[in-house]
Amino acid sequence: MGKFEVLDHPLIQHKLTLIRDKHCSTKEFREIVNEISTLMAYEVSRDMPLMDVEIETPIGKSIQKQISGKKVAIVPILRAGLGMVDGMAELLPVARIGHIGMYRDEETLKPTEYFVKLPSDISERQVFVVDPMLATGGSAIMAVDALKKRGAKDIRFCSLVAAPEGVKALQEAHPDIDIYTAALDEKLNEDGYIVPGLGDAGDRLFGTK
């Protein structure tokens, strides 16, 4: 079974409270999501493999640690996932960026895939799938399906807010992946929104309704 972890760093929790507030402007929401994503990148990359390298400091030669060259990809689920890309890429600047397009049918709450564009060597990369909300889990499951179909093996899912129902569904569908979130909220309401949640992340990021 993959790992499930709530990232409870004080800075992450503080900033998450700011964007939950309905009075948070689009500009502020976008900036803070970016900041949280950078902090999350630090946490979710803790186990990246290291190797010994010989360097020369101004004083002399030394054996030190360096990331071993594991390739990374950041794959947002469109469109809300785009808000998390730049923040994660701040700490992982050599990451390739893929995209998976999904939209949710407001009647059935089921996701539909409409676009997939990934690095050609996705099977060799550690993949961070990003989406601010893990609600029903439908979009996350379909995104991981699409990645595995194209050869991805090392997959981690990163969200800002998750519902227990979504976590359970994703774990049951893909028990091998790790799931990280900044908050595990109470439940889904009858409209499929996370309670208390933060509203529609895509609309709040892009100023649409």
Curated annotation (Swiss-Prot):
Pathway: Pyrimidine metabolism; UMP biosynthesis via salvage pathway; UMP from uracil: step 1/1. One of its GO terms (biological process) is UMP salvage. Uracil binds at residues 194, 199-201. The keyword GTP-binding applies. Binds 1 Mg(2+) ion per subunit. The magnesium is bound as Mg-PRPP. Belongs to the UPRTase family. Catalyzes the conversion of uracil and 5-phospho-alpha-D-ribose 1-diphosphate (PRPP) to UMP and diphosphate. This is Uracil phosphoribosyltransferase. The lineage of its organism: Bacteria, Bacillati, Bacillota, Bacilli, Lactobacillales.
